[in-house]
Swiss-Prot record:
Has a role in meiosis. This is Serine/threonine-protein kinase ppk35. The gene is ppk35. It comes from Schizosaccharomyces pombe (strain 972 / ATCC 24843) (Fission yeast). CDD domains: MobB_Sid2p-like, STKc_Sid2p_like. Residues 545-559, 596-609 have a biased composition (Basic residues). The active site is at D285.
Length: 624
């Protein structure tokens, strides 16, 4: 609310009277001066006694008594029904999205005016010694660049601004593509989802939740979101491209991991989980598929659709029904080797690609399935399952069928067995087994909620990580695996959707998507409810947007000190990538060097003109 609104609100009679009576208001936005003014006008126009009584009763109902956690009592000028509407999660999300939208709008506007003023001062300083005719010509070009930037700033982000290069993945309601933004040549992972399918599968909240989490974080352990936009049919999430594939592919290729390797990856997973918990969220769907490996071999966490407590009652009922139906089946005894072979066979058949209704049962905590209250410790349960799989070769509660997996989860206390234990309960020392520290960590994760780790600090103090330096995991530690990439467009660590075997493995996923689209079409839901996607649009804004005046001088100074050899000249095709921090393309620097070498000596006016043109182009590209 602006100062004028606050002044008007303070001068309002009802508010002044309420202040005299000692009434405290928790939120000025809930006190609409227009609403109060309408009430005053209404009371002035009332003539009969009955109408006055009705109006007074209605006015009393508008004051809702509220108690905050600190025990203070305050009143809000809202009806109970209006308070109930405001307390809904979707209303709170829309209100927050509205606030974030206007904050970003005013911040970007203020920064633009600040940078435009700096550019004007620089232009004036560089052209003050030129002739008036040349000043007019340069001024006209300067204004043209400013107008071009403003026009480009008003342009909405569209799918046509990106080139879809390679398909990276396919889900039940959308697909993921490697895309390149045309004006900046950024390589991004574009997630495309149909609105009608999302609404039919009740996945709208999951997508909105993922968008909200990604826009609130700037952690190096979480995948970064650059753009979120929509059209009439689809919604789009343009995220950071992580070329090393997911941790599931790495596990399938490597099989069993040594404890040193497991310790490294678990430590980075703990750091990623801690970043999510600091935002006030629970991931709830941790599994190897959601951890990605970047080009340097480090871990990044993705897929936040099931984060925090947003599971619907229907989904919980389905899970409870599946769990109850799996209470009394016959469970034949299987050795560790047999269970490992069965799980490998399931991975080869790709039967887990469609198995994500509300998380993965192999990694879900029992209290989530029971429908009980749970906290962030459910993520530590999933972490223990991943640790067990890294060391043993399969999740601790996996089965040959989904029904058997539910059964194992129900009897989790009996199914959790230390590896290399035979039928007689004797450990074989010659076999490859889990160390005492690792098993202590696993059992500390896979236990009752009150007995689990309660924070990441407790995990860091566990003996399993005693030889690990937590500070500087990304800088000091050397990853066990670093992806070998031929170029930036290398997608060899993802499924090749031109291969018939891969398409055959995803046939159930395509069938699920086709049925959802047909059902949405039969129900008359073509483009989905557009109101559900309000506040979805997002555009990444760097933390520091400073003009690039000094950086050009630093670049020229570096070129003078360290001239490049002709034999090691950089190719233009390798210089297309844009740095998000610097905002300039290397291809422009290369072209500038070529022009300076070929044209030779130039006059002072031409050098000033070229300098202003280049700085303006780089700066506008950086701001966009």
């Amino acid at each position: 609310m602006d100062l004028l609104g606050l002044k008007e609100l303070d001068n309002n009679k009802l508010v002044s009277k309420a202040k005299e009576n000692g009434v405290e208001f928790s939120d000025l936005f809930l006190l609409s001066s227009g609403y109060l003014r309408d009430r005053e006008n209404a009371s002035a126009s009332v003539s009969s006694k009955n109408e006055r009584m009705v109006l007074n009763e209605e006015r009393q109902n508008c004051w809702t008594k509220r108690n905050d956690p600190k025990g203070l009592t305050y009143y809000q000028l809202l009806k109970p029904s209006e308070v109930e509407i405001l307390s809904r999660p979707e209303t709170r999300r829309k209100r927050m999205a509205c606030q974030v939208f206007f904050l970003n709008y005013y911040i970007s506007t203020i920064e633009y005016h600040k940078l435009r003023k700096e550019r004007l001062e620089e232009f004036t300083a560089c052209t003050s010694s030129l002739k008036q005719s040349k000043q007019k010509r340069l001024w006209k070009e300067h204004c043209g660049r400013e107008r071009a930037f403003l026009r480009k700033k008003r342009t909405k982000i569209q799918c046509s601004h990106f080139d879809l290069l390679v398909k990276l993945g396919q889900g039940g309601y959308g697909s993921v593509w490697l895309a390149k933004k045309r004006n900046t040549h950024e390589l991004l992972a574009m997630k495309m989802m149909k609105k009608s399918t999302l609404q039919q599968l009740n996945e709208v909240k999951h997508i909105l939740n993922e968008r909200d989490i990604l826009t609130n974080t700037n952690s190096e352990w979480l995948v970064k979101l650059y753009y979120a936009f929509q059209d009439k049919e689809k919604v789009y999430l343009a995220m950071e491209y992580v070329p090393g594939g997911d941790f599931r592919t790495f596990l399938t290729t490597k099989g069993l991991l040594h404890e040193n390797q497991t310790r490294f990856y678990l430590a980075e997973m703990v750091a990623a989980i801690s970043a999510v918990h600091k935002l006030g969220y629970m991931h709830r769907d941790l599994k190897p598929e959601n951890f990605l490996i970047d080009q340097k071999g480090h871990i990044k966490l993705s897929d936040f659709g099931l984060s925090t407590a947003i599971v619907t009652s229907n989904q919980v009922n389905r899970l409870q029904h599946a769990l109850v139906s799996a209470v009394n089946p016959q469970r034949p005894y299987l050795t560790q080797k047999q269970r490992r072979n069965i799980y490998k066979a399931l991975l080869e058949k790709n039967e887990n690609k469609v198995n994500s209704v509300v998380g993965s049962p192999e990694y879900m905590a029992p209290e989530v399935v029971y429908g009980k209250k749970y906290d962030r410790t459910v993520d530590y349960w999933s972490l223990g399952c991943i640790c067990y799989e890294c060391l043993v070769g399969y999740p601790p509660f996996s089965g040959s069928t989904l029904q058997e997996t539910w059964t194992n989860l129900y009897y989790w206390r009996e199914m959790l067995q230390r590896p290399s234990k035979n039928e007689n309960g004797i450990y074989d020392k010659k076999a490859r087994s889990v160390s005492d520290e690792a098993w202590s960590f696993i059992t500390k994760c896979l236990t009752e909620p009150t007995s689990r780790f309660q924070s990441t600090i407790e995990i860091q103090k566990h003996p399993f990580f005693k030889r690990l330096h937590w500070n500087g995991l990304r800088k000091r530690a050397v990853p066990p695996f670093v992806p070998r990439l031929e170029n930036q467009l290398d997608t060899s660590y993802f499924d090749d959707f031109n291969d018939e075997q891969v398409l055959d493995a995803y046939k159930d996923v395509y069938e699920k998507q086709r049925k959802a689209e047909q059902k949405a079409k039969s129900n008359g839901v073509m483009n989905g409810n557009q109101r559900q996607f309000l506040g979805f649009t997002f555009k990444y804004r760097p933390n520091a947007r400073k003009p690039l005046v000094g950086r050009h001088r630093e670049k020229r100074q570096l070129r003078k000190e360290k001239p490049e050899k002709k034999n090691n000249s950089t190719k233009q095709k390798d210089l297309i990538t844009v740095s998000h921090n610097k905002g300039t393309t290397a291809i422009e620097d290369l072209d500038e060097d070529k022009r300076s070498k070929t044209k030779g000596h130039k006059t002072k006016s031409s050098r000033v003109h070229r300098l202003l043109e280049r700085k303006g182009k780089d700066l506008y590209e950086f701001l966009l």
